[in-house]
């Protein structure tokens, strides 16, 4: 609502005297926005995932959002628990690097929660969300071509486990 002009000074004085701080939880109950985005990663040990977090966090802060980050360490149960927690905590969106969940599990945890999700680096087949993927095959072909152009003939590929989408 509106505040009468003659009351503004006394309100500001009371705010300063009481060192009042906005309660983000109370605000989110009224506005239905938490100004927080969940970031769910398999690990921070790999430089790629650390860079996903750091870049996302920077952009979120620039736009007035806070990040809530969880790592599930390739553990199916933790991935499921953290996804459920972040959605239940009322995040306004989710940046998610999936690894173990099926479409059915994902739908069960996110059903009736209108939370936008961006899957990064991998995707759960059958889940309708925005997706950011690397062109790994194209990049590998370019790298091998460059090595061949420079005279290399004995070229090996060291990849991750075939169960991880980006290693296929």
Could you tell me what each predicted segment is?
Residues 25, 78-82, 104-106:
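Short acidic active-site motifs
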Residues 94:
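Intrinsically disordered, low-complexity polar regions and short flexible loop motifs
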Residues 13-17, 55-66, 84-90, 103-104, ...:
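Bacterial carbohydrate/catabolite-sensing allosteric modules
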Residues 1-35:
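N-terminal helix-turn-helix DNA-binding module of bacterial transcription factors
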Residues 22, 31-45, 63-65, 91, ...:
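Interdomain hinge and pocket-entrance segments immediately C-terminal to HTH DNA-binding domains
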């Amino acid at each position: 609502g509106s505040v009468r002009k003659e009351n503004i000074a006394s309100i500001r004085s009371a705010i300063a005297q009481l060192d009042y701080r906005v309660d983000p939880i109370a605000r989110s109950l009224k506005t239905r926005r938490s100004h927080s985005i969940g970031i769910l990663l398999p690990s921070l040990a790999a430089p790629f995932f650390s860079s996903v977090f750091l870049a996302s966090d920077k952009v979120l802060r620039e736009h007035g959002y806070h990040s809530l980050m969880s790592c599930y360490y390739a553990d199916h149960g933790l991935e499921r628990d953290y996804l459920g927690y972040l959605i239940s905590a009322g995040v306004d969106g989710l940046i998610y690097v999936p690894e173990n969940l099926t479409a059915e599990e994902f739908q069960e945890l996110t059903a009736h929660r209108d939370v936008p999700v961006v899957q990064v680096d991998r995707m759960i087949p059958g889940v309708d969300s925005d997706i950011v993927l690397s062109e790994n095959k194209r990049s590998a072909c370019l790298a091998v071509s460059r090595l061949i152009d420079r005279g290399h003939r004995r070229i090996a590929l060291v990849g991750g486990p075939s169960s991880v989408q980006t290693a296929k």
